[in-house]
From Swiss-Prot:
It is a single-pass membrane protein. Cytochrome P450 monooxygenase: part of the gene cluster that mediates the biosynthesis of domoic acid (DA) and derivatives, natural products with neurochemical activity acting as ionotropic glutamate receptor (iGluR) agonists, thus being neurotoxins causing amnesic shellfish poisoning (ASP). Catalyzes the conversion of N-geranyl-L-glutamic acid (L-NGG) to N-(7'-carboxy-7'-demethylgeranyl)-L-glutamic acid (cNGG) via three successive steps involving N-(8'-hydroxygeranyl)-L-glutamic acid and N-(8'-oxogeranyl)-L-glutamic acid as intermediates. It comes from Pseudo-nitzschia multiseries. Keywords: Heme, Iron, Membrane, Metal-binding, Monooxygenase, Oxidoreductase, Transmembrane, Transmembrane helix. This is N-geranyl-L-glutamate oxidase. The gene is dabD. Its cofactor is heme.
Amino acid sequence: MNIATASLCAGLAVSGKFLSKYYQFLSTSQSDEVGFIEIMNMGMTGNDAVACASLGFVMYCVLSFARSYYRFRFSPLRNAPGFGPKSFVYGMFYEFLEAPFMEPPIEALKKLRKGGNDIPFLAYTTLFGSQRLLLLDCDLIKQVFTAPSGRDPMRYPKHYVYLREVVGDGLVVVEGSEWSRHRRIVQPAFQSAFLRDAITTTVPTLVENLVDVWKKTAGTSINLNAHLSIITLDVIGKVAFSHEFNASKLLNEWAECPDKELGEVDDPLISSIGAAFSSSPLKLMLTVLKQPWLEKHLSPAFRTSRNLLNKAADDIVQNAKNIDDPKRRSVLNLMMEAKDDESSKARNKLTDTELRDEVKTFLVAGHETTSTWAHWSLYVLATRPDIQEKVFADITKHSPDDKTILLEQADQMEYLWAFMNETLRLYSPLGLISRVTHKEENFKGYTIPAGTNLRIPIHLIHRHPDHWKDPEDFKPERWFDTEESSKRHKFAFIPFAAGGRNCIGQRFASMEAKIIVANVAKNFEIHLADSMKGKKITFSNFISLKCKPEIEIYVTPRG
């Protein structure tokens, strides 16, 4: 008898209760260590446990495959508008993977619209028949975004199972009543006068350093994303966590030798979060199986990076607790002190673990959003000299001297704000948002099965001809057109999402981005680098909207 046969026989001999429990554990989208420990405590050890676990895993794969194929074969969405039936195994996976971000649905929408039909969504499948809907109808988007967010169970939960393994149970990931508790505690810190004061005193100083570096290296090719990420990283460190990343020193080092690339930020939080997000075949396989939590048990490298990340975030929390100087207080300090009147005394404040998870969450979400927004704003200025001059005229009108622009002045610049809104429309940092149907739904006469993944393609909605006049044209003036604005659906412009779960940091991002862009545009004429001439920009999306190749510019100091 070979080993495989012996293992199978041993597995068949073990308790049916174990197998039932094991399949129940693996098949749920919420499976985690609690269920795993429960199984391991059922009394089996040695070869029996190994054989049973192996058999259980095989059974899970077979039954999941059969269930997925049945859903795929008899799905009510097979005849819905979209890409039509594809391979069960691959679906549209490779088309979406290989094409620029959102290009397949944009092309599909153009073809379907020629028939004059109303297209409320585009249906498609990915690996192993997994159902997806790209929502295009603003009423449907409103329905999803405005569904009550603080109830258990939620009507349209997020189920960000992979992100949860890296950032933990922060505000972006938690669901239902637990999300409501977090939001009530955290939100006052982002609406406080403290935040505006902190932005006003922190950002101009960091931008002054950037301007000085660019003046010293005028005419040199600048990697836009890398340089702006330096600024926004230091901002979120100081304002949100009272933490010094000291990233800006890399700009000064680069100025001494601009032919070299920027160095890496020497901080354990940054290095460990990059390692935790790195891709691997194991990560892809576990994501497909909807069991990403297993990675920390199967991958020593991921386990190490996650432990280092948690340790670095824990240290930031503890250091913030020890701050006595009022001038060094941060958003994190306000979150530590905040209380929720609707929770019990034992639950009315965030625990140290919850604070740690919020640190990781705000670093990933806040840092990327602002740097991406500023990045695309400067790209537009480099490619549209006519708009650059209009922005410059608005800036000099409100800031005629050579002083650094502060937030109070930037708030008065109406054309600048229209320009930045138009940048958000065509180059929204958040390109896509996901939800999942908790139960069967009816969308515009189509039956939507429970467990269907809903994709809200902000990048596509902001370019949809049903919602925008001349959608591909970059026109800041449209934001002064009150008639056009009054006709536009309120959910046609959603750069920070909408409803109860909108981005809590949008005020933070808006204040910071305005100061950065205004000061750069005031001090420099911005041009695309010669290396960019003749190259086509294609979009990609990971955390925020990126592109290939990376944008490079050069600047010429004004007057």
